């Protein structure tokens, strides 16, 4: 937001953004209202909440009766988030807890929120493997449309689809584990990813591929992660 704001202020004509940002609460709503939903709680990403705050989550927690715990990204942060979520489930509670107070406030970052409101506007967004979720994305507002690469370079018609064998959408919704997908670790690896959850190093499939906590697929059997696979995920040099 600040980059395109500065580009407009400076009158730059060689700067463009291809915006694909998403909003978390509408995605949670879509997951929780699906008939096959199995999700019992959420760990809310601390870096998102450091900007957006936590005010959007209490209504979701109450409506769907699930705990929402804001966490950081260090191992202890994540473990603490899981611990707090499990304790809520054990007590039959469903509320928002902030386990990342060193970075997250309820009101978020007011200056950043004002910038977001000026530069972006909310739109419906297609999620790979899931489909279209209303009000779940952002695009540049009319005032900044000249910097929108989708508008400027006429790429709106470009569409990509995941192969039928890829079950990343089900992984994203918590319906299956990565190792339940027949492509996992065979045709789908971090070097040859088929879906969003393997493309990103933060994705569930990429994490399973690296740490290999399950052994119920041919690719997962064995005594550990081969050195070649470790090098794929952790390149040196």
Question: Residue locations for each model-derived region?
Answer:
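Fold-independent oxyanion-binding glycine-rich loops
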Residues: 3, 20-22, 45-48, 72-73, ...
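Internal helical hairpin/lid segments
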Residues: 80-170
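Solvent-exposed alpha-helices and their adjacent loops that cap or buttress functional pockets
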Residues: 7-12, 31-41, 59-63, 158-160, ...
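Detector for the Zn2+-coordinating histidines of canonical Cys2His2
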Residues: 227
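A conserved active-site cap/scaffold subdomain adjacent to cofactor or substrate pockets
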Residues: 18, 38-101
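Extended hydrophobic packing segments that form well-structured cores
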Residues: 152-222, 231-237
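Phosphate/pyrophosphate-binding betaalpha-module
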Residues: 1-56
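Predominant activation on well-ordered alpha-helical scaffold segments within soluble catalytic domains
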Residues: 1-5, 28-29, 54-61, 76-87, ...
């Amino acid at each position: 937001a600040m980059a395109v704001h500065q580009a407009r202020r400076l009158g730059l004509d060689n700067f463009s953004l291809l915006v694909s940002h998403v909003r978390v609460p509408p995605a949670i709503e879509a997951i929780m209202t699906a008939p096959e939903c199995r999700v019992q709680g959420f760990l809310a990403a601390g870096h998102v909440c450091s900007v957006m705050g936590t005010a959007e989550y209490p209504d979701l927690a109450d409506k769907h009766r699930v705990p929402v715990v804001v966490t950081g990204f260090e191992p202890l942060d994540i473990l603490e988030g899981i611990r707090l979520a499990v304790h809520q489930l054990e007590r039959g509670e469903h509320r928002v807890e902030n386990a990342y107070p060193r970075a997250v406030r309820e009101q978020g970052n007011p200056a950043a929120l004002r910038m977001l409101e000026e530069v972006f506007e909310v739109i419906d967004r297609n999620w790979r493997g899931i489909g279209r979720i209303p009000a779940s994305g952002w695009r540049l507002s009319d005032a900044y449309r000249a910097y929108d690469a989708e508008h400027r370079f006429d790429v709106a018609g470009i569409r990509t689809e995941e192969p039928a064998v890829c079950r990343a959408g089900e992984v994203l919704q918590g319906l299956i584990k990565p190792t339940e997908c027949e492509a996992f670790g065979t045709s789908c690896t971090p070097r040859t990813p088929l879906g969003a959850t393997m493309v990103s190093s933060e994705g569930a499939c990429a994490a399973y591929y690296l740490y290999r906590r399950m052994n119920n697929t041919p690719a997962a059997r064995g005594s550990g992660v081969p050195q070649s696979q470790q090098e794929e995920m952790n390149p040196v040099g």
